[in-house]
Design a protein with these regions (language model features):
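Bacterial N-terminal signal peptides that target proteins for export
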Residues: 19-34
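N-terminal Rossmann-like dinucleotide-binding module
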Residues: 38, 42, 46-98
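Hydrophobic residues in well-ordered beta-strands that form the structural core
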Residues: 58, 146, 171-173, 314
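Beta-loop-alpha module in the N-terminal Rossmann-like domain of NAD(P)-dependent dehydrogenases
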Residues: 98-163
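C-terminal helix-rich "cap/oligomerization" subdomain common to oxidoreductases
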Residues: 120-122, 348-392
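Rossmann-fold dehydrogenase core element
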Residues: 159-177, 200
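Predominantly a Rossmann-like dinucleotide-binding segment in NAD(P)-dependent oxidoreductases
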Residues: 180-261, 265-269, 387
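Contiguous beta-strand/loop segments that form the cofactor/metal-binding neighborhood of enzyme cores
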Residues: 242-319, 347-356, 379
Length: 392
């Protein structure tokens, strides 16, 4: 019996050890519950932040693309927290048109930021002023989106890049064509259809009859036709589209050289800047021709991609055609709008800032790609002035 008793005794734990184990288990349960609760609260907080509109300040109203941001408010992704515009009459004109509260109009960007504390700023002033916007916003951690192109010069662009990287902000460039379903489908067809071979030539047509001819307002026309404020004429205004698309389609590759010819076909209307520009980008195995003009018979933004044995044409925002192999007939399609947030610049801006999507270096809006765009435009201006091909 003593043997049986000893065996049983070994199996039983002392009472104080059992109580201690129970206490430990309770503490572990409470800790686990607390951790789960904290994670749930954090997740809820992140989700709530994601659902809140991005608070954007507007820097300047002299670029008429500013109508775009007012129209985008209805999507629910952004809130315009304030407007910085020194021209009070112009600011009140927009406020009246869009029923915007006039007590949120400020004379300077610094005043707007101090009063409204925006998360981000969208610049709709002259291209020359883009640098100043970044100089004000970057040290404060405020993200920035500018209208195309990134900067008035390569020097400005590199300074803006340095500030954005130093202070960890997003700096995006908005192009109308970035939101075209056709350009994205063209790239997808090119990538998916290996049978058509590599790119041999890209031809980009952008422009309209001329800014004065289409009736842009005086505030826009004044700086758009100023070589200091705009950097050039049609070369800057519409050459940037082709440089952006070409760099994107070439997966970030820079051209070997740039050659440009500019003209003043209407010097009586545009005496200070070019109104016609042709830019040729030479790559090791392909070529891009950018035709930027204020002399087209109608507005156009279209793109042709010639591959070894196929042609893809983005005719406008929604209409695309393609022909693969000489024996095949052309196929034409009409594309629906892209899904949110890829259909609108400000929905996209919000998604980038809130880190709902990842902005890649070769994205059409991304800073590295747009610095390359500025290298191309800088070389194009130097080429047009010298009559020589510029190597990059």
């Amino acid at each position: 019996m003593s043997v049986i008793f000893r065996a049983t005794a070994r199996r039983q734990k002392p009472l104080y050890r059992r109580k201690n184990n129970i206490s430990i288990m309770k503490r572990q349960t409470r800790t686990t519950t607390l951790v789960c609760l904290c994670l749930a609260m954090l997740s809820s907080s992140i989700s709530a932040q994601t659902k809140q509109p991005l608070r954007i300040g507007v820097a300047g109203l002299t670029h008429t693309h500013v109508h775009w941001i007012f129209s985008s408010v209805k999507n629910g992704d952004i809130e315009i927290t304030g407007i910085a515009e020194p021209n009070r009459e112009l600011a009140e004109r927009y406020a009246d048109q869009y029923n915007y509260p006039k007590n949120r109009i400020y004379k300077t960007l610094e005043e707007l930021i101090a009063a409204e504390n925006p998360e981000a700023v969208a610049a709709f002033n002259s291209i020359y002023e883009h640098l100043e916007v970044v100089e004000i916003c970057a040290p404060k951690g405020i993200h920035v989106m500018v209208e195309k192109p990134l900067a008035v010069s390569l020097k400005h662009a590199r300074k803006m890049q340095q500030l954005a990287n130093q202070h960890g902000i997003f700096l995006l460039t908005n192009y109308e064509t970035t939101w075209y379903p056709t350009v994205h489908q063209a790239r997808k067809l090119m990538q998916d259809s290996s049978a058509i071979g590599p790119i041999r030539k890209i031809v980009v047509h952008d422009g309209h009859q001329g800014p004065k001819e289409i009736g842009v307002n005086k505030e826009f026309l004044d700086w758009l036709t100023d070589p200091i404020q705009n950097g050039a004429g049609a070369l800057t205004d519409f050459g940037c589209y082709g440089a952006d698309l070409s760099t994107w389609l070439m997966n970030g590759q820079k051209p070997v050289s740039v050659m440009a010819i500019t003209q003043q076909i209407k010097p009586d209307i545009y005496p200070k800047v070019d109104d016609e520009a042709t830019i040729v980008l030479t790559y090791p195995e392909s070529q891009t021709i950018i035709q930027a003009s204020w002399n087209w018979p109608f507005s156009r933004k279209d793109l042709e991609i010639y591959c070894r044995s196929g042609l893809i044409t983005a005719k406008d925002r929604n209409n695309l055609s393609y022909r693969f192999q000489e024996k095949n007939k052309e196929t034409a399609v009409t594309l629906p709008e892209r899904k949110p947030p890829f259909q609108d610049p400000f929905s996209f801006f919000k998604a980038v800032v809130r880190k709902e999507i990842t902005l890649e270096d070769n994205d059409l809006s991304a800073l590295p790609l747009n610095v390359t765009v500025m290298e191309i435009l800088d070389a194009a201006k130097r080429s047009a002035k010298s009559g020589k091909r510029i190597k990059l």
